[in-house]
């Protein structure tokens, strides 16, 4: 336990006050130091810099700023001080990206410039993916870099699902569920149909790019969507992924 003198109420109150004061001052000093580094970088780039140092939950205050209407784009790192080997994305980054109403740039490699490799855009036919396409084409034109569009679908999931279900269904239940017919329907209609739909989205994206005077490479990917897209990014050594949220 604590030494006897620290067990006295007055001493404990004093120590709490000292601790709170030191922590508050220390955090302010750390925040100012972060700002100083950013301010110096902006000064070199001849860009204006404004400091925001709100008190509260870090992710909540960042989200609050994105909702203020004062900003168009948020940039933040994928990992922070709590990163450990094997981490892919930090909790602050994940919480902020989920809640941010404005476009968000997530930096995963601070030593690599956007444009040092192709720009990849994810397409699913939605309004937001169309917006992502236009953004990717604009950045690609400005930087003189290739833009690739990908669409991904998972034709393998139902095989896993049906195999799992087959292991627990009785013959009678299988007849009620029309198990074999359902399986055939997925193979012949749903899988092929989804592939055709996503391929058409890619072709429309390619025409949109052509109308804007841009070249666009397209590719239909199969597999777990996040994994298929991530593997493609590695394959082409992409410098930026643009997707709608």
Residue ranges and their predicted role:
Residues 1-74, 187-241:
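Structural beta-alpha unit
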Residues 1-18, 43-50, 117-184, 207-217, ...:
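Small/aliphatic-rich secondary-structure junction motif
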Residues 75-78, 104-109:
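Short beta-strand elements of ligand-binding domains
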Residues 78-79, 151, 244-245:
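Short secondary-structure boundary segments
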Residues 89-90, 244:
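Glycine-centered tight-turn and secondary-structure capping sites
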């Amino acid at each position: 336990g604590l030494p006897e003198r620290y067990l006295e109420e007055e001493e404990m109150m004093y120590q709490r006050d000292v601790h709170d004061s030191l922590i508050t001052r220390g955090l302010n000093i750390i925040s100012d130091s972060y700002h100083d580094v950013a301010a110096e970088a902006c000064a070199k780039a001849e860009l204006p810099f404004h400091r925001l140092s709100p008190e509260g939950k870090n992710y909540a205050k960042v989200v609050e700023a994105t909702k203020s209407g004062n900003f168009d784009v948020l940039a933040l790192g994928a990992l922070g001080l709590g990163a450990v080997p094997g981490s892919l994305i930090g909790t602050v980054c994940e919480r902020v990206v989920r809640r941010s109403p404005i476009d968000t740039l997530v930096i995963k490699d601070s030593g690599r410039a956007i444009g040092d490799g192709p720009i990849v855009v994810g397409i699913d036919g939605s309004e937001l993916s169309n917006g992502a396409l236009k953004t990717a084409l604009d950045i690609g034109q400005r930087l003189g870099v290739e833009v690739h569009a990908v669409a991904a679908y998972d034709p393998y999931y139902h095989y896993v699902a049906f195999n799992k279900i087959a292991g627990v269904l009785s013959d009678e239940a299988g007849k009620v569920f029309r198990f074999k017919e359902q399986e055939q329907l997925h193979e012949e209609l749903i899988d092929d149909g989804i592939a055709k739909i996503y391929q058409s989205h890619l072709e429309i994206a390619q025409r949109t790019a052509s109308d804007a005077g841009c070249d666009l490479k397209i590719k239909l990917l199969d597999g777990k969507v996040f994994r298929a897209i991530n593997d493609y990014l590695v394959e082409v050594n992409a410098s930026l992924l643009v997707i709608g949220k």
